[in-house]
UniProtKB/Swiss-Prot annotation:
<protein>
    <recommendedName>
        <fullName>Homoserine O-succinyltransferase</fullName>
        <ecNumber>2.3.1.46</ecNumber>
    </recommendedName>
</protein>
<feature type="site" description="Important for acyl-CoA specificity">
    <location>
        <position position="323"/>
    </location>
</feature>
<dbReference type="GO" id="GO:0005737">
    <property type="term" value="C:cytoplasm"/>
</dbReference>
<dbReference type="InterPro" id="IPR029058">
    <property type="entry name" value="AB_hydrolase_fold"/>
</dbReference>
<dbReference type="GO" id="GO:0004414">
    <property type="term" value="F:homoserine O-acetyltransferase activity"/>
</dbReference>
<feature type="active site">
    <location>
        <position position="354"/>
    </location>
</feature>
<keyword id="KW-0963">Cytoplasm</keyword>
<dbReference type="InterPro" id="IPR008220">
    <property type="entry name" value="HAT_MetX-like"/>
</dbReference>
<comment type="function">
    <text>Transfers a succinyl group from succinyl-CoA to L-homoserine, forming succinyl-L-homoserine.</text>
</comment>
<dbReference type="Pfam" id="PF00561">
    <property type="entry name" value="Abhydrolase_1"/>
</dbReference>
<keyword id="KW-0012">Acyltransferase</keyword>
<keyword id="KW-0808">Transferase</keyword>
<comment type="similarity">
    <text>Belongs to the AB hydrolase superfamily. MetX family.</text>
</comment>
<feature type="binding site">
    <location>
        <position position="355"/>
    </location>
    <ligand>
        <name>substrate</name>
    </ligand>
</feature>
<feature type="binding site">
    <location>
        <position position="221"/>
    </location>
    <ligand>
        <name>substrate</name>
    </ligand>
</feature>
<comment type="subunit">
    <text>Homodimer.</text>
</comment>
<feature type="domain" description="AB hydrolase-1">
    <location>
        <begin position="45"/>
        <end position="360"/>
    </location>
</feature>
Amino acid sequence: MESIGIVAPQKMHFTEPLPLQNGSSLAGYDLMVETYGTLNAARSNAVLVCHALNASHHVAGVYADNPRDIGWWDNMVGPGKPLDTDKFFVIGVNNLGSCFGSTGPMSIDPSTGNPYGATFPVVTVEDWVNAQARVADQFGITRFAAVMGGSLGGMQALAWSMMYPERVAHCIVVASTPKLSAQNIAFNEVARSAILSDPDFHGGNYYAHNVKPKRGLRVARMIGHITYLSDDDMAEKFGRSLRRAEGALDAYNFNFDVEFEVESYLRYQGDKFADYFDANTYLLITRALDYFDPAKAFAGDLTAAVAHTTAKYLIASFTTDWRFAPARSRELVKALLDHKRTVTYAEIDAPHGHDAFLLDDARYHNLMRAYYERIANEVNA
């Protein structure tokens, strides 16, 4: 199916201070927003799509001045696609602390005239949800037909259903978890350590030195990317293949240059990421991942944490996702069913690991299409 076509982002400015979970507040801030489709007269067909770590408000479509910059979930959102923009008004919001136009470490601190850098406050999933709620208010949307997200975006969708139960009809959580495991926190710590130990980091104030801690960002991305793929997927894509010119002998070089195809792939991904992403943003977002644990306020009891939810849920996981394994989704499903919530759960047999939520898998997309048809029928009832 074709893309939704040319889209244009908009910047929303908010002057009312935003209270943050750390006890401080953000006095004034911008959020980058993109919308697709048409909001109906009743304002009842809106869907909020929450983004994952390195994504943004640019969910679907292309920009007129850069047609190669395709939205990160373009295969999911658009006319005739599972989230059909002929039926729904879809909103993408770039979260606070990001590096794609919303207020973050790269933004100018009005009190100093310099980039916030390391002084930008640590933000949480809950802070993002509160900021997104203000975007909804600007559109006059009192209740979303659905809030949807994959990975970290799924955590935001879950948080929406818990923080604003009266504003969410359906909550769609894909390849996500109600909290990070110790192993996942450990992966994030190793990635952050790579950035913090880069000589170009300068305590987070590298903008003043006109440098970027690219070496640390490369390693951080390489670590992360390994966790996004399954072992079978990596074996199929790369195996133990060596990088060799055509006709060259299949022999080792006995040095530390790139020899295996998988090494080349990881370095390419790391280089690409370091060119466009911001190191301070990476630190902030991974820490927000670490902190997300809505059951913490209930002595670790997830069932108690979801007691006041009212939404209907679609929870989807992928069999080869070892970053956020299906067991984590089943834990959430059980907690919701303990309160007799309406829950649809799908555990999809897909070989691509955590990144499967971004791919065009027929079973996965058919599930989403059918679920959104159900929501459309409710909206139009």
